[in-house]
């Protein structure tokens, strides 16, 4: 269980997050909806300890989140961060290994993931050759292949057509059904109501 208690973040006089309280439980999805500047990404960055809260606490099973816990977090940032010169396979294996998955295990799962998310192309294709939608699906695979217990998805459907949005939603629901705690942000209320 992830718990945010009285979480706030100020940047000078600007209040980005104000007294946020929430509990995320295994097998549940929580969707955050709001305009740009509403504090969604700031909340994710505080959970990940990229930025420090002004006040409040974030706990995993009633204790502070540790470095070991971070190995169990899958994160899809809003700013896509794939290395353009790497192949799809190199990219995904790199992220899987960063999260403690063996290269052999990641490699054996790769074809299955590419098929399930309907990525057009081969594992040996360079990331720079991918369409925006396929690049987003590859980044999603990199965030999920190691089977994280806690998944943070910042605007996972941004720029996707309805078919690819549906594919990504199905994958999020599959991970939820396997017991992952999932939080995501969206500008679209329909996306939030469909999977939360």
Q: Which residues are covered by each model-predicted region?
A:
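Catalytic Walker B motif of ABC-type/P-loop ATPase nucleotide-binding domains
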Residues: 151-154
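Conserved ABC transporter NBD signature motif
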Residues: 56-69
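Helical segment within the ABC ATPase nucleotide-binding domain
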Residues: 166-178
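Conserved ABC ATPase signature
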Residues: 126-130
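Conserved ABC ATPase "signature" region
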Residues: 93, 97, 104-122
């Amino acid at each position: 269980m992830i718990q945010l208690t009285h979480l706030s973040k100020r940047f000078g006089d600007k209040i980005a997050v104000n007294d946020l309280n929430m509990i995320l439980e295994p097998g549940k999805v929580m969707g955050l909806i709001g305009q740009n500047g509403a504090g969604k990404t700031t909340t994710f960055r505080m959970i990940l300890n990229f930025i420090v809260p002004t006040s409040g606490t974030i706990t995993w099973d009633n204790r502070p989140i540790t470095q070991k816990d971070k190995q169990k977090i899958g994160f899809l940032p809003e700013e896509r961060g794939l290395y353009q010169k790497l192949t799809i396979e190199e990219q995904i294996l790199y992220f899987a290994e960063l999260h403690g998955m063996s290269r052999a295990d990641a490699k054996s799962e790769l074809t299955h993931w590419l098929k399930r998310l309907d990525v057009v192309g081969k594992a040996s294709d360079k990331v720079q050759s991918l369409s925006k939608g396929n690049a987003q699906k590859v980044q999603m695979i990199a965030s999920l292949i190691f089977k994280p217990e806690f998944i943070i998805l910042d605007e996972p459907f941004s720029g996707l057509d309805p078919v690819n949005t549906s594919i990504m939603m199905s994958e999020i629901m599959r991970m939820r059904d396997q017991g992952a705690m999932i939080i995501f942000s969206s500008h679209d209320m329909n996306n939030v109501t469909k999977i939360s």
